[in-house]
Swiss-Prot record:
Contains 5 disulfide bonds. Disulfide bonds: none annotated. GO terms for cellular component: extracellular region. Expressed by the venom duct. Belongs to the conotoxin D superfamily. This is Conotoxin Lt28.2. It comes from Conus litteratus (Lettered cone). Probable neurotoxin. The keyword Disulfide bond applies. The lineage of its organism: Eukaryota, Metazoa, Spiralia, Lophotrochozoa, Mollusca. Keywords: Disulfide bond, Neurotoxin, Secreted, Signal, Toxin.
């Protein structure tokens, strides 16, 4: 087998081994990206964002969005907002 053919064969087989070892890519979830983008635009950023990411200085409210800091309950590990009226 000539050198060029051998090289092409190796280049064809190599990516298949890499894909099998890594596995398929995770499914893309557009809803999570939209929520994350909305939170970056509207939610109040402070030094430790993990518990306060749902709290905002503005009176915003929503399921996975954020709500005003006055009504945001951050007593547990995750902040919760009251239901929208």
């Amino acid at each position: 087998m000539p050198k060029l053919e051998m090289m092409l064969l190796v280049l064809l087989i190599l990516p298949l081994c890499y894909i099998d070892a890594v596995g398929p890519p995770p499914p893309w979830n557009m809803e999570d990206e939209i929520i994350e983008h909305w939170q970056k635009l509207h939610c109040h950023e402070i030094s430790d964002p993990t518990p306060w990411i749902l709290c905002s200085p503005e009176p915003l409210c929503g399921g996975k969005g954020c709500c005003a800091q006055e009504v945001c309950d951050c007593s547990g590990p995750v902040c919760t907002c009251p239901p929208c009226l």
